[in-house]
Amino acid sequence: MGLLSVNPGGHAMRPAVLLPLVVQDLYYEIGGKCLLEDISFRTDAGPRTVVLGPNGAGKSLLLRLCHGLLQPSAGTIAWAWATPEVARRCQAMVFQRPVLLRRSTAANITYVLRLQGIPRRQRRAMITEALEQAGLLPLAAQPARVLSGGEQQRLALARAWALKPQVLFLDEPTASLDPAATQAVEALLDHIHCTGTKIIMTTHDLGQARRLADEVLFLHHGRLVEHAPATAFFDNPQSKEAIAFLEGKLLW
């Protein structure tokens, strides 16, 4: 998980401006098989970007490449004025199944703050803010492993957001959650968005995409088929693949 850099006084800071993110002629191959092909797009600060597509379209793979967990076979991923090293420190990623420490709820956030060199005297306020926004402050002393699935995902989000990353990648963050837990996660994402963090996420849930997306990247068979404002995509899709997907038809 990439986090913000910290100045000598121990304060989190937003160094170079990351956005826009520009992806150009991106390819990714494994064992001679091309999984992502000729993908190009630009996304700016502000709009929430939702990556849609059927299973196997390459959605999660695209997020991992943009986050720097994987290296492209060809093409470029460029972050405005930030070097790759700075970019990694100014972004975070949360996965479908949260990976939490076998410690208390609060200690999971303490850990990332300590890694970033935040002085102990400043951590408490940052931990309290993150847990409060996630609705987890009353559970601060509880072991993370006894939290419900929805609470664990909110903890993963709170931990990722504690240092105010400029960009937050989310890979199917509510795929295994019930409607109530999904609603709580979406409310937290709304708050994170309102603080200025850019959200780029994948989802299979068309209802969720309609609720959250400001712009849509639609992938099919490893290719970017459509990139459009959410309203335009849902009201007037341009490709036969997107039309079929929105109609609930199976794509392969």
Regions found by a protein language model. Give the residues of each.
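Helix-to-loop junction immediately C-terminal to a conserved catalytic motif
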Residues: H67
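Conserved ABC ATPase "signature" region
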Residues: R121-L139
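Conserved ABC ATPase signature
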Residues: P143-L147, E151
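Catalytic Walker B motif of ABC-type/P-loop ATPase nucleotide-binding domains
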Residues: L168-D171
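Helix N-cap at the start of a conserved alpha-helix in ABC-type nucleotide-binding domains
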Residues: P179-A181
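H-loop/switch region of ABC-family ATPase nucleotide-binding domains
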Residues: T203-H204
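A short, surface-exposed alpha-helical micro-motif characterized by mixed small hydrophobic
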Residues: A209-R211
